[in-house]
Every structure is written in structure tokens, then in C-alpha cells.
A protein has these predicted regions:
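An anion/pyrophosphate-binding glycine-rich loop and adjacent beta-alpha core
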Residues: 1-100
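Glycine- and aromatic-enriched mobile tails/lids
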Residues: 25, 42, 158-159, 166-169, ...
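Flexible, glycine-rich terminal cap/loop adjacent to redox cofactors
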Residues: 43-47, 166, 178
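Active-site-proximal substrate-binding core of FAD-dependent oxidoreductases
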Residues: 74-77, 154, 186-195
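Residue-level signal for secondary-structure boundary elements
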Residues: 82, 86, 122, 126-130, ...
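A glycine-rich dinucleotide-binding beta-alpha-beta segment and adjacent secondary-structure elements
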Residues: 97-170, 177
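A conserved FAD-binding loop/helix module that cradles the flavin
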Residues: 167-191
Length: 195
């Protein structure tokens, strides 16, 4: 797989993982997500989650400037030191990457959660915590930081059906498709009842 730049705002940085059809790249990739609750970022606005996301994206951009993506070997992440050179795994991010200490970029509780998760995954997937594994940040768009309110009929207001990732009801292609199917079934149900 590959990690690609998925930034959508000037001077903000976002990455995402992908694979070509054959899935025969030199690396495998996976996203390790950390649960972030409103209590982790809420100040006084429904947009505080978006502001928290943007703060991380801006901080990552500032570390790399000109879209250099922060990367770090897992052993260096664990030892809280900047990576000086890559090991047996080469980052695939384009256009360029920059060695950084992720511990200095993300909040401590996120770093602690990532380390705990990577070690836990290694108990099920041998080598997941390989010293030379490359961490690439930030993948901040795995789910929406806001959620549009809707009722049991999937309506936000008459004829407006907020569904899928952008509306905050799913976190990927499959869950978006499922949410869309559920919404379509509700619409069909209403049409059949003459509503």
C-alpha cells in the first residue's frame, strides 16, 4: 500500500492510505485510529471538533513546510526520539517526507493510545510493532468531527437526508454505503405509506 497526501486546505496536512488494484506495493499499510471524545476537545462550540482536527493538520504542516509529511520509525516513537534514518521499510508518501518526533506533535494521550494499540495489535499480527515500521501522520479524516442532526426518518429537515461520512454517520466506504441503503429504505417506506 501507499500513504498519500489527502490535504484539502492550504497550509494544512492530511494523509490517507490506499492500495493499487493488485495490492502488490512494497509496503503494507494500515491506519491505527484513536478514539477522540467531545470531552477531549470541547470548549464551547459545536465546531470545536473541527477546530481540534484543523489544529493537528496545521501543526503537522508547520513541521514539514511545503507538505513534507512527518514520519517516524516505531522504535524512535516508543523511545521519544527523532528518526535519523530509515530502516528496512521505506516510506511511500509523496511528494516528500520529513523525519519528526510524533511525540512532540500530537497530544500525549493520543501518543500513549497509539503505542498501546500498536503493541496490542502485535499480539495478533506478528511484526505489527516492528522497530522499523513507519508511522506517518496525520490521518485526521477517518470520520467527521461534526454530526448533522437527523430524526428517525433520516431527515434533518424536509427533503434533506444527511447520510454518510460528511454528515458524521459513517467512517468509510462500506459504512457510508450501509447508511445510504438504510436511508433509501426509509424513503421507500415513506413513499409506500403515501407520506
Amino acid at each position: 500500500g501507499y500513504v498519500v497526501n489527502a490535504s484539502s486546505e492550504n497550509e494544512h496536512l492530511v494523509v490517507n492510505g490506499m492500495s493499487n488494484f493488485a495490492r502488490d506495493g512494497i509496503n503494507a499499510n494500515s491506519a491505527v485510529l484513536v478514539e477522540i471524545k467531545p470531552s477531549d476537545y470541547y470548549v464551547n462550540s459545536p465546531l470545536d471538533g473541527l477546530n481540534f482536527q484543523r489544529m493537528i493538520e496545521k501543526k503537522c504542516y508547520n513541521v514539514g513546510k511545503d507538505y513534507g509529511v512527518p514520519v517516524q520509525r516505531y522504535i524512535d516513537f516508543k523511545n521519544n526520539q527523532i528518526t535519523k534514518e530509515i530502516g528496512k521499510i521505506t516510506p511511500t508518501i509523496k511528494p516528500r517526507y520529513i523525519y519528526a518526533n510524533i511525540n512532540d506533535i500530537l497530544p500525549k494521550w493520543i501518543n500513549d493510545s497509539l503505542k498501546e494499540a500498536i503493541e496490542a495489535f502485535s499480539l495478533k499480527i506478528n511484526g505489527f510493532n516492528c522497530d522499523d515500521a513507519i508511522l506517518t501522520i496525520p490521518e485526521t479524516r477517518s470520520s467527521s468531527p461534526i454530526q448533522i442532526k437527523r430524526n428517525e426518518k433520516y431527515l434533518a429537515t424536509k427533503y434533506i437526508y444527511p447520510i454518510g461520512e460528511g454528515a458524521g454517520f459513517s467512517g468509510g466506504i462500506m459504512t457510508s454505503a450501509i447508511d445510504g441503503i438504510k436511508c433509501a429504505l426509509k424513503i421507500i417506506e415513506e413513499i409506500n405509506r403515501g407520506e
